[in-house]
Structures are given as structure tokens and as C-alpha cells.
Regions:
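DNA polymerase processivity clamps
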Residues: 1-83, 96-201
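Specificity-determining recognition surfaces
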Residues: 89-92
Length: 201
């Protein structure tokens, strides 16, 4: 799974969540009406089961009972065991990231291009080649190679260079996003993906 645990935070500005699998950090914004001053650690597998049993439009009341968190609404109750321990300050971490350049593009186009080059099945790495207003996805093997370009809009800096990423992790991240995305390359060739409600690092 992408995440092992999720830090669920009820803040003064609404519901927030953060998680990491050691290679990728994800933050997301939820309902702005769910305010408070509580931070909880929940197994990602438990939240995954809950999401499979409901839809985005469903609304729940949330409470804690000892070492468990309970989500409930009419004729439905779901309980998950809370995890102990602290969590990294993701706001501070994300705020420290400085992108060398950023571009605006469409998640659907990125998914289609990535799927196209991975169809040759030559491994688990994909190269992202930035050429100003174009982003080219590339994969290569001993006897075969594939590339798929998409149009991007340069926002900051000068998009240029080749960057290699884990294809499986990139596929997983893109599946969870939709609409337009601000894609950036930070220090050390780190990839950042930012949408209106989520941030992937």
C-alpha cells in the first residue's frame, strides 16, 4: 500500500491528513467544517476499508473511545484501532521544499503517457525529460524503447533536464489525483505534485 499509517488532524481550519511509506509523503485537505485541535494516528489499511464502504458524499460523525476512533452515521458504525506515537511535522517539511522549476499539466495526460511507455515492460524506472513547454516520459530496455510527450505550461524557473523515478510509485500517486496538477522538481531531483486538495512529495 502507498501508506502504512495516516495522521488525521482536526485543526482550526478543518480536517487534514498526512501519511508516508518511507519513499513518498502525502498531505491532503478535507472538510473545512470538521474543526478541532486533535491529532490521531490511524492504520492506513483501516481507512482503506472504510473508504471502500462509503462514497465521497457520505458524512460521518467522529469520536474516540479509549484507544479507538469511531466513524458513525445512521445505521452505520466503523471503529479502528488508534496507533501510538508522534508524527513528523509535514507542514514544516513541505514548507521547506524549494522547487527549481514548476509546470502546470493535466493528470489524465500524465497517466496516459506513463501507461503508454510502461507498456513495453522493461523495468520499474521511468525518465521524465523536461523541454520547456513539453514533458516527455521515456522508458528503455535492451532492444526496445518508448517515449510519450505531453504539453505543459511553465510556471516558475526554466523546465529542463532528465529525472528518473520509480514507475510503480508514480503510477500509484497519479491514480489518486485528478484534474490539473502543479508538477515541480526540487533539490536532489525530488518530484513534487500539488493539486487543490493534495500534495505529494
Amino acid at each position: 500500500p502507498l501508506l502504512k499509517c495516516v495522521n488525521l488532524m482536526f485543526t482550526s481550519t478543518g480536517l487534514r491528513a498526512a501519511g508516508s511509506n518511507g519513499n513518498c509523503i502525502v498531505t491532503a485537505r478535507g472538510d473545512n467544517q470538521s474543526t478541532g485541535d486533535v491529532s490521531l494516528l490511524i492504520p492506513a489499511a483501516s481507512l482503506g476499508k472504510l473508504s471502500n464502504m462509503c462514497q465521497d458524499k457520505d458524512e460521518f460523525r467522529v469520536g474516540t473511545t479509549g484507544k479507538s476512533i469511531v466513524f458513525f452515521r445512521e445505521n452505520f458504525l466503523f471503529s479502528a484501532r488508534l496507533m501510538e506515537g508522534g508524527y513528523i511535522d509535514t507542514d514544516q517539511l513541505v514548507g521547506s521544499i524549494r522547487n527549481a522549476f514548476t509546470v502546470l499539466t493535466d493528470i489524465h495526460d500524465m497517466r496516459a503517457a506513463l501507461s503508454s511507455v510502461l507498456s513495453i515492460g522493461t523495468g520499474n524506472r521511468v525518465k521524465l525529460n523536461f523541454q520547456d513547454q513539453r514533458l516527455v516520459f521515456q522508458c528503455a530496455g535492451d532492444c526496445v524503447s518508448a517515449s510519450a510527450p505531453i504539453e505543459v505550461i511553465a510556471l516558475t524557473g526554466t523546465p529542463a533536464g532528465d529525472y528518473w523515478f520509480n514507475a510503480k510509485q508514480l503510477v500509484t500517486c497519479l491514480k489518486a489525483l485528478s484534474g490539473t496538477v502543479t508538477l515541480g522538481i526540487a533539490q536532489g531531483g525530488m518530484l513534487t505534485l500539488a493539486t487543490q486538495d493534495a500534495y505529494y512529495l
